[in-house]
């Protein structure tokens, strides 16, 4: 009888652990006209995720969307483009860095960076053509990502 109870308990623990690995965490990013870091921002503007985590981009203010920046998506990963004024949920399965923009406000510097899993920022991200106001914001996010390198 004791062996049966031990087997059932072991199976229950194994099942609960495997179920926890199957589902990622959920995050929310607000798209704002005005935020803590100025006008036309994502909050937060930098996220560290694990593969399988999901981000819900919330159009808190009108005229925003979330879309990947050309040239700033990990090799083998698909980009995405949400519709204006609509929430979009994206599950990030591929490790690497994702540059994200608001299409209508890219020229105003509305960008964010998402890091999924481990790894270093690809050097070619620094040479991607960007609007003048987006470049300093992304450079600051690149520095933040590099400062987090190796942290859990």
Predicted regions and their residues:
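Cleavable N-terminal signal peptides
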Residues: 10-12, 22
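N-terminal signal peptide c-region/cleavage motif recognized by signal peptidases
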Residues: 18-19
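Extracytoplasmic/periplasmic copper-protein system
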Residues: 24-35, 108-152
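N-terminal edge beta-strand
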Residues: 25-51
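Histidine- and aromatic-enriched segments that form or immediately flank copper-ligand environments
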Residues: 58-83
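Short, conserved beta-strand segments of beta-strand-rich sandwich/propeller modules, principally
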Residues: 97-99
């Amino acid at each position: 009888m004791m062996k049966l109870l031990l087997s059932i308990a072991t199976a229950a623990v194994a099942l609960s652990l495997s179920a926890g690995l199957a589902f990622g965490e959920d995050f929310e990013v607000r798209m704002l006209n005005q935020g803590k870091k100025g006008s036309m921002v994502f909050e937060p503007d930098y996220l560290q995720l694990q593969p399988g985590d999901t981000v819900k981009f919330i159009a808190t203010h009108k005229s925003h969307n979330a879309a990947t920046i050309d040239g700033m998506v990990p090799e083998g990963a698909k980009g995405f483009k949400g519709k204006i004024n609509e929430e979009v949920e994206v599950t990030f399965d591929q490790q690497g860095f994702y540059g994200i923009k608001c299409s209508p406000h890219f020229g105003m510097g509305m960008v964010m960076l998402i890091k999924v899993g481990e790894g270093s920022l690809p050097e070619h991200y620094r040479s991607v053509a960007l609007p003048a106001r987006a470049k300093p914001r992304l450079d600051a996010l690149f520095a933040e990502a590099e400062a987090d390198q190796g942290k859990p």
